[in-house]
Amino acid sequence: MNYQVTGNEYISLPTIRESDGVVEGVTFLYMQVKGLLELRGKAGLIRPYMEAEGQRLPLHPKWTREHCWIPGFTSEERTFRFSCVYLTPIGERGFMVRLVLENTGDAPQQVRFGVEGEWSQTLHEINETTELNAGREAYESGWNHMFIFSQKPGLPLFAFAPCVADPQQFAQIDQHAEWTRDGFAYDIYRVLTLQPGKKAVLDIPWGVGYDGVAAATSAKELLRQGFDAVYERTVRWLAAREKRLADSRLSKILNTNLFFAFFYASGRTIDTEELCLMTSRSPRYYVSAAYWDRDSLLWAFPAILTVDAAYAREILAYVFTRQARNFGVHSRYIDGTMLEPGFELDELCAPVIALNRYVEQTGNLAFAKQGFVQAGLQSVLSRLEAKRHPVIPLYETFLQPTDDMHNYVYLTYDNALVCCAMRALATLLERPELEQAAQRTRQAVYAHCVKEQDGRPFFAWSVDLNGHYDIYDEPPGSLQLLPFYGFCGEDDPIWKNTVAMIRDKSYPLSFAGHAIAEIGCKHAPHPWILSICNSLLSGHAESALRHLRRTAMDNGVACESVNEDTGECETGEAFATCAGFLSYALYCALAR
């Protein structure tokens, strides 16, 4: 099934069905529960509909996505044109639904149109999903002159509410809307006689907050601002950040994935309003709503930095406070506490590389000199030294970039990242001797990680310093990226031999000869979208673009892997951090 997606800093609509326009669920981040909460309905939380002369008319949506982020559909049936737009305004704790019904016939028609739905469950989502059974309630309130849904397992947890009218003396708004509620089921609608050639409009704001007052007034605020005003404000924000390419299809892919990364790989919590990072705010991604240094800082962060340096700085402030205690640990909750244990060397290097990227792009070295940032950098350096071989300047890892167990503990790619991080630390910590340490590690890689096959030297994937090694590659941490991280040049013959080996048909996970000849790995044995990114950044842009054009991924949004022959999504739908790296790689290859 295909889905449309949209969202802002606070609210995500990750499952808008293309077939009928139904919103299956709404998600938001919540710091006290360490992840995502989702409101869902059995047949849909929000279901647009239209009726004529007492008969429900079927919907046949034809979709658009304004500025690659504002989804809407039009459905034509008999003598009616029905349209629906889902708008998640920038900076607002809510979203709006605009419905427009037009009579294209030559006779008046008695019509009814609106949205109906039900709140049937609340889900807590961090990798896995758990239903919250306690404390759901629905009641009517004077704050929105409608109903409020709330969850109070003792103290309030959250509330969710619409608002379609405001009868106050100085701000009266009357859309001639009606509503009904039966328990947790509702219907919000207009009934009228629609004249030929005329349109009727219904705007339905929804708000989310800690309690009923916060939710209701969030919706009322949107109603008072008006759909057109918040739409124009959101469009201006999006247009200011869009990247334009000569190829319209590639431009659409770049910007769709850019905004998906911005709003699904980061967000603000409803309860504390803190900015935080995660793999994906979509529950469709199989490890959603948790934090990985690598995913957030090596993949999503570069894309976000290209469009919003201030937001990128706030991201780094979160990383060097909430997440600093567990730098290098496999995965964490959004509050920084450990989720999955296991040391990953690439993740330990990621905060340093991201910070250095920010400083180089903005020139804001003062941020890096702040005490909490310096403390975080010192902790990275200390942890690095604890993973160094006692004699040879190579650094070990426990888990590989896929989070899978290592074969041998010294990974070439990981040690290339160490070189990159050490060079950055030399500047950021004003420790020039670390530049020499980086050079010694680089020399150690060439001395111990370069092997030979058929008379041609190449970089092994991993080694144990006792003569054992393996030939392998992982798209989340590919040997193709050694020049990208400054370890070697693209003219390095050893690197060129390595890339030729892992892209050759004889390498079982190269998928050479298939329609999408990009590298996979044992974690997901199909071509990875991250491999397309790696190819774009390593001198194989022409073939990468050809492969990208052959896959729809997850309805235009990055996924983990695709079928090598059909291009259909195989694993990892709604992969937000990967979406960031895809948009950044396209930008580097085509726009910069």
Question: What residue ranges belong to the model's regions?
Answer:
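C-terminal capping/lid segments that line or modulate ligand- or cofactor-binding pockets
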Residues: 1-36, 288-291, 341-361, 469-489, ...
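Extended ligand-binding clefts on enzyme/binding-domain cores
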Residues: 290-293, 379-381, 389-390, 408-419, ...
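The feature captures the catalytic groove of carbohydrate-active enzymes
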Residues: 201-220, 285-286, 331-332, 337-350, ...
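Terminal accessory carbohydrate-recognition/targeting modules of carbohydrate-active enzymes
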Residues: 1-244
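An acidic-aromatic substrate-binding cleft motif
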Residues: 220-280
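Active-site-adjacent structural elements in folded domains
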Residues: 82-84, 278-287, 334-339, 401-412, ...
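Long, well-ordered core segments of solenoidal/helical folds
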Residues: 257-269, 307-330, 372-393, 437-456, ...
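Aromatic-rich carbohydrate-recognition surfaces in CAZymes
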Residues: 287-390, 415, 573-592
